[in-house]
Amino acid sequence: MEVLESGEQGVLQWDRKLSELSEPGDGEALMYHTHFSELLDEFSQNVLGQLLNDPFLSEKSVSTEVEPSPMSPAPLIQAEHSYSLCEEPRAQSPFTHITTSDSFNDDEVESEKWYLSTDFPSTTIKTEPITDEPPPGLVPSVTLTITAISTPFEKEEPPLEMNTGVDSSCQTIIPKIKLEPHEVDQFLNFSPKEAPVDHLHLPPTPPSSHGSDSEGSLSPNPRLHPFSLPQTHSPSRAAPRAPSALSSSPLLTAPHKLQGSGPLVLTEEEKRTLIAEGYPIPTKLPLTKSEEKALKKIRRKIKNKISAQESRRKKKEYMDSLEKKVESCSTENLELRKKVEVLENTNRTLLQQLQKLQTLVMGKVSRTCKLAGTQTGTCLMVVVLCFAVAFGSFFQGYGPYPSATKMALPSQHSLQEPYTASVVRSRNLLIYEEHSPPEEPSSPGSAGELGGWDRGSSLLRVSGLESRPDVDLPHFIISNETSLEKSVLLELQQHLVSAKLEGNETLKVVELDRRVNTTF
């Protein structure tokens, strides 16, 4: 079994190169009147564009093909994953690699398979290193491009919508199945090391509810053949798994219907895929090795197509939700901008009102301050005036002549002198005579003046005044000294007796003593 499986792996590796040497334009013999591409959707046309490059689609035998040189590098097993459109220039149309012989039976497939398995032992494949960068043209890059669709498929898309009723009728008849992902890997002998992720250019798909290729590649027993196990293991192995999208889809046949003996009923999707790949449609059980391998291969491709459709659906839903969020955010942004503009306008108006109020308040404050200043000045002036009036009346008794008016009455009351009707002595003449030196002769003028003074003294005697002898007195003698406090000495004048005496004349000072006596 190890040699057989390794031989099959070699066939899978080398037929990708040999299929490119096949002649185009031979595949119209196996086509029905209604082409199979009309029954496929747009995604299946994209996916199955490169699936037709297979060893069973070539008319020529492998013995007539070009023998590969032992030194040429073996392509990676990723060639089986080239179910999407390839951007290499040598990618042919899906119709170019379909065989023209309608009598393609299982015996020829088995003989061809055994022939190739003996020519390519397993040791030669295992010893060859796997390069990170495969040669161009041998291993296509797995890239999905929606726009890169060939023109024959685009022209045949309208009939595809007309045949949807046939598919729905077939889906109601076919029972629901469940395909384990690791069963496909058991036939294809895949491992995670043989299919690195670096060569895949597909975007990461979101996690789906059904099984995918990654689940099948992580199978713990990839070398075990499913038909070598008892038939009772299939339902027990499928029981603990959760229900997936494949179990509810009628695109795949149930695994238990592929075992045993009897007629085999495949789904329409499996039949279309087998025809597109160039494989014969098996009709009875048990299946041969080639039929079993072909059926597992197309079942794997159908499951990958369903997974891609699910991922696209989820991606579309995600993008729709993002678009809705963007629209809502844009509308909200516009509303917020309008609100900001309204708030800015209100802020401007409020600032203008605030400035007006500030100017009004400042004007009122300045007026009140001025009024308060004038009122304060007026009050101070009134207070000063009141103080001036009060203190002026108080200090009026301290004038220059207070004794003549105010001090006379209390002094008169205090003395209480009796009224005398006798002669009141009111005035006194004080005479001070200076005797001339004896050697100077007396002039007649001076004698006349002395005679005048003598006559004055005689008048004083007549009036009753006592005359005093002429004696030299050192100072004046006041005869009446009764009321000295009330007397006011007034110096009326100083008489220059005579300027003609030439310094020898005597100066006479007449002082008047005024004595004011008031009577009541």
From Swiss-Prot:
Residues 400-520 are lumenal. It comes from Pongo abelii. Residues 195-264 are annotated as: Disordered. Residues 1-378 are cytoplasmic. Upon ER stress, translocated to the Golgi apparatus, where it is processed by regulated intramembrane proteolysis (RIP) to release the cytosol-facing N-terminal transcription factor domain. The cleavage is performed sequentially by site-1 and site-2 proteases (S1P/MBTPS1 and S2P/MBTPS2). There is a cross-link at residue 178 (Glycyl lysine isopeptide (Lys-Gly) (interchain with G-Cter in SUMO2)). This is Cyclic AMP-responsive element-binding protein 3-like protein 2. Residues 294-357 form the bZIP domain. Pfam families: bZIP_1 (PF00170). Its main location: endoplasmic reticulum.
